[in-house]
């Protein structure tokens, strides 16, 4: 099922999803364009078709436009900035609210008087999934973290997904981790990328540090010690 496929990073499951999208669940002949059209439709609903709104330069996202079987696991020519993945996982964490992003909380004058405040703005809401379907995704992302030794004995329940972004056969993959916590009632979502970082567990270790600081598990002095932690291992480490 989808929860187990997420938890085990099972490419075969999602290859099959991509193929089903291109064959209307096996009812028609394979149609690459039809499969890609469906992937683009859902990716757009989750905010992956445009920049997030932050007030700094941001690359335009690229939703895959070929090879739906590969695109279904994030390959093909999918291409996203880390913050775009951050908004994507935030939408998953809150069951479909896609927010306009901003770096600003408020603007003050030189005397500290508030001139303008910035409230959260919802770009759109994904209403094509029901609670059972959202919960299946949440369960799978929780299973991912339960398979990561990085989070052994971590006091906050985290849900997330590891990944490796491939750029060149001559350099290591980019290390990726997206997630949110607490699992049952999310307060924070996060996307981490280490350029050419080899394994997603390096990114997961960094994300754990952010969660640790946010939830007062460790303070800055403990975390910023100049030493890299052992990244640990996972039963799905070869499948990211």
Regions picked out by a protein language model, each given a short descriptive name:
Residues 1-194, 237-240:
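Beta-lactam-recognizing serine transpeptidase/beta-lactamase-like catalytic domain environment
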């Amino acid at each position: 099922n989808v929860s187990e496929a997420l938890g085990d990073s099972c490419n075969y499951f999602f290859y099959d999803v991509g193929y089903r999208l291109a064959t209307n669940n096996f009812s028609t002949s394979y149609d690459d364009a039809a499969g890609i059209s469906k992937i683009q439709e859902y990716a757009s609903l989750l905010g992956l078709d445009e920049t997030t709104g932050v007030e700094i330069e941001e690359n335009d996202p690229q939703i895959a436009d070929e090879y739906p079987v590969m695109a279904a696991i994030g390959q093909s020519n999918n291409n996203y900035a880390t913050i775009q993945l951050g908004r994507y996982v935030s939408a998953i964490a809150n069951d479909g609210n896609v927010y306009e992003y901003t770096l600003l909380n408020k603007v003050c004058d030189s005397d500290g008087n508030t001139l303008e405040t910035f409230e959260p703005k919802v770009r759109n809401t994904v209403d094509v999934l029901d609670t059972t379907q959202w919960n299946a995704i949440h369960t799978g992302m929780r299973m991912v973290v339960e398979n990561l030794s990085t989070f052994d004995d971590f006091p906050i329940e985290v849900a997330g997904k590891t990944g490796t972004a491939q750029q060149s056969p001559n350099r290591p993959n980019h290390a990726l981790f997206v997630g949110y916590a607490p699992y049952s009632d999310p307060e924070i979502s996060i996307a981490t990328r280490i350029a050419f970082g080899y394994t997603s567990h390096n990114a997961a270790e960094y994300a754990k540090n952010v969660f640790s600081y946010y939830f007062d598990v460790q303070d800055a002095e403990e975390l910023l010690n100049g030493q890299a932690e052992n990244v640990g291992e996972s039963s799905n480490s070869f499948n990211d």
